[in-house]
Amino acid sequence: MAEGEGWRPPRPCEAYRAEWELCRSAGHFLRHYYVHGERPACGQWRRDLASCREWEERRSAEAQADSLPPGPEGEPRVAGAGPNAVTGILTRNQGTERPHGDTR
């Protein structure tokens, strides 16, 4: 198999565009600023969208590499590494929060 031939972006490009537009919306900005005290960083959604579109147009190896999360320092980027291998975002129940309905 040629390099990159069997690889596809984990989501359709339309999903990245929708996430980027949501991230840039006024409502999201206000909620994020209220909770975190800083502007939301939407650049990764924009880069993911650009990589996805480049992949659809050219099947570019650079687009594939750009969509992979960074590996530990000095190690290559690995598909499936990161907060959530499908969406690339942390879910609400990751970290110290208890799952919904847990009354402990």
UniProtKB/Swiss-Prot annotation:
User: Which post-translational modifications are recorded for this protein?
Assistant: Rapidly degraded by proteolysis following neuronal stimulation, resulting in increased AMPA receptor clustering.
Compartment annotation? Synapse; Synaptic cleft
Give the matching InterPro entries: Pants/Emi1-like
Domain of life where this protein originates: Eukaryota
Which family is annotated? Belongs to the UPF0545 family.
Q: Which PANTHER family match?
A: UPF0545 PROTEIN C22ORF39
Its annotated function is as follows: Negatively regulates long-term potentiation and modulates adult synaptic plasticity. Stabilizes the interaction of RTN4 isoform A/Nogo-A with its receptors, inhibiting clustering of postsynaptic AMPA receptors at synaptic sites. Upon neuronal stimulation, degraded at synapses, reducing RTN4 signaling and allowing AMPA receptor clustering at individual synapses.
Protein name (record)? Synaptic plasticity regulator PANTS
Upper lineage is: Eukaryota, Metazoa, Chordata, Craniata, Vertebrata
